[in-house]
Amino acid sequence: MMRIMLFLATNLAVLIIASITLKLLGVDRFTGQNHGSLLIFCAVFGFAGSLVSLFISKWMAKMSTGTQIITQPRTRHEQWLLQTVEELSREAGIKMPEVGIFPAYESNAFATGWNKNDALVAVSQGLLERFSPDEVRAVLAHEIGHVANGDMVTLALIQGVVNTFVMFFARIFGSFVDKAIFKNEDGHGIGYFIATIFAELVLGILASIIVMWFSRKREFKADEAGARLAGTGAMIAALQRLRAEQGVPVQMPDSLTAFGINGGLKNGLAGLLMTHPPLEDRIEALRRLG
């Protein structure tokens, strides 16, 4: 899923910008003493950031990757790509998404969009050049699985919940620091502002661990969908090809590399922020499906 990290970054940026704006406008002072009102206030802005990210996800993905949408196929490869996505979409019971190709040497693909009937599926030029037709079909089926499963909407809801609690507890922490350490009893001072922003950054990272855990679980489900649509053997072969290419340098920005079918490698604590399970685990899970 070549969308998660940009989605998270957008959410965090919205939270911080909202915090600064609300502080400058003086809105925070009306919610600081009433925790019920504060929670509602945080929920409104927490879900706003999540929904903004969801609704502009296609535009962000196109701009960030340089994806060229195929409207009129110019080659037999583009024609095959459109026909394959149309067939897989029909089998999955969704409206055909937009189809695109983005210029990247590494083998990758992504699907995004605010609902299953208004989505985008794109593959890298490198994947088209090096993968067999059956393997490309399996990768497309995996991405169609994400769309059919409604993963982006579910992710937006989860992100909205964690955004809410990040904003809420950051402000509780900010009030404590402002009063207990800075001894400010007259509204919100500079201590509140600094502590709130700091807490949002820290809690935002911790909240990302929850979202990444969800993302890893959904990868297994997308693999299962890919196996149903394209065949278990083809899905395993595609993942094995990705595993063989793990040493290929990634040309895309770091904020986007975790958005695709190939999520890269991380070890130790960094593994908690992986959007994808290890390829070995995904292959083994497919083998258990038979």
From Swiss-Prot:
- Indicate the residues that form the catalytic site: 143
The terms under GO molecular function for this entry are: metalloendopeptidase activity; zinc ion binding
Q: Does the keyword Membrane apply?
A: yes
**Which GO BP terms, alphabetically?**
proteolysis
The enzyme's E.C. designation = 3.4.24.-
UniProt entry keywords in alphabetical sequence? Cell inner membrane, Cell membrane, Hydrolase, Membrane, Metal-binding, Metalloprotease, Protease, Transmembrane, Transmembrane helix, Zinc
InterPro entries found in the cross-reference section:
HtpX_protease, Pept_M48_protease_HtpX, Peptidase_M48
Task: Identify its protein family.
Answer: Belongs to the peptidase M48B family.
Name of the protein described by the UniProt record: Protease HtpX
Q: What organism, scientifically named, is this protein from? A: Ectopseudomonas mendocina (strain ymp)
Q: Which gene encodes it?
A: htpX
